[in-house]
């Protein structure tokens, strides 16, 4: 919340909260609750999900939740959506209460969300209330070229995670621009680039924060649990 307030004072436009599960160093497992708390303690900055991992939720649940947020905080909510589970297979199985399998249809889930957020004429037997006529902005998140095709086909904004796949960013952007189809949401492509950055009062402190993040990446690759270390004298050895 403190960081969101600082960014709001600096006139930043949006602040996003991720969805991750079974990570001790990450507290954003209940994404919508954190978003609501930040919205309640700020005045104008847009706050959203970066993002909701659709395999973990039904479109109806997502539409009800974010339709409620949009009703409480009009024009301040973003709904970024992704196709990954945001966790390991074992944890995903517990979320599903069955063996995890990539069985959901990402594009169909997004189309269903658009219907739930749309007008009365677009609704079916089941409605998301509140949600109707809220038109919550949907942004496609991804770290691969496949998500670029989806965003382009649906004419939606696209946010690429370069902190996960920096080598694919240029290709993904090219695909999105080349295949983009205008929609009722966008006349032209809208691309957001997510980058990893560390800021501090001094260069030394920023460097220290950066090395902590690097250590966290190493621990993730090694499938090590626990909080990130604040300092590691063997960092260079581990990096090699």
Predicted regions and their residues:
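The substrate-binding groove and active-site-proximal loops of carbohydrate-active enzymes
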Residues: 23-24, 48-56
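Conserved, mostly hydrophobic/aromatic
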Residues: 7, 11, 19, 38, ...
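Flexible, glycine-rich active-site loops centered on histidine and acidic residues
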Residues: 1, 55-118, 158, 166
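An alpha-helical appendage that flanks or caps ligand/catalytic pockets
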Residues: 93, 99-127, 168-240
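Hydrophobic faces of well-ordered beta-strands that scaffold small-molecule active sites
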Residues: 15-17, 47-50, 77-81, 137-141, ...
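N-terminal beta1-alpha1-beta2 module of alpha/beta enzyme domains
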Residues: 1-45
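Glycine-enriched alpha-helix->loop->beta-strand junction motifs that scaffold or abut catalytic
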Residues: 41-44, 73, 152-159
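A conserved active-site cap/scaffold subdomain adjacent to cofactor or substrate pockets
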Residues: 148-167, 172-173, 177
């Amino acid at each position: 919340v403190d960081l969101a307030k600082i960014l709001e004072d600096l006139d930043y436009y949006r602040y996003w909260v991720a969805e991750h599960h079974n990570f001790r160093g990450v507290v954003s497992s209940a994404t919508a609750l954190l978003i609501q708390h930040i919205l309640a303690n700020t005045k104008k900055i847009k706050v959203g999900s970066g993002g909701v991992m659709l395999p973990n939720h039904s479109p109806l649940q997502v539409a009800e939740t974010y339709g409620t947020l949009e009703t409480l905080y009009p024009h301040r909510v973003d709904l970024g959506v992704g196709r990954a589970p945001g966790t390991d297979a074992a944890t995903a199985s517990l979320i599903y209460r069955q063996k995890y399998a990539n069985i959901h249809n990402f594009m169909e889930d997004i189309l269903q969300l658009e219907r739930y957020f749309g007008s009365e004429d677009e609704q079916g037997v089941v409605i998301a209330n509140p949600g109707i006529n809220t038109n919550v902005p949907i942004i496609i998140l991804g770290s691969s070229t496949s998500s670029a095709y989806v965003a382009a086909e649906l004419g939606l904004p696209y946010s690429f995670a370069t902190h996960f796949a920096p080598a694919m960013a240029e290709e993904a952007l090219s695909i999105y621009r080349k295949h983009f189809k205008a929609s009722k949401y966008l006349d032209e492509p809208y691309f957001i680039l997510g980058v990893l950055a560390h800021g501090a009062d001094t260069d030394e402190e920023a460097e220290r924060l950066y090395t902590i993040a690097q250590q966290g990446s190493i621990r993730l690759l090694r499938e090590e649990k626990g909080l990130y270390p604040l300092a590691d004298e063997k960092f260079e050895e581990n990096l090699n």
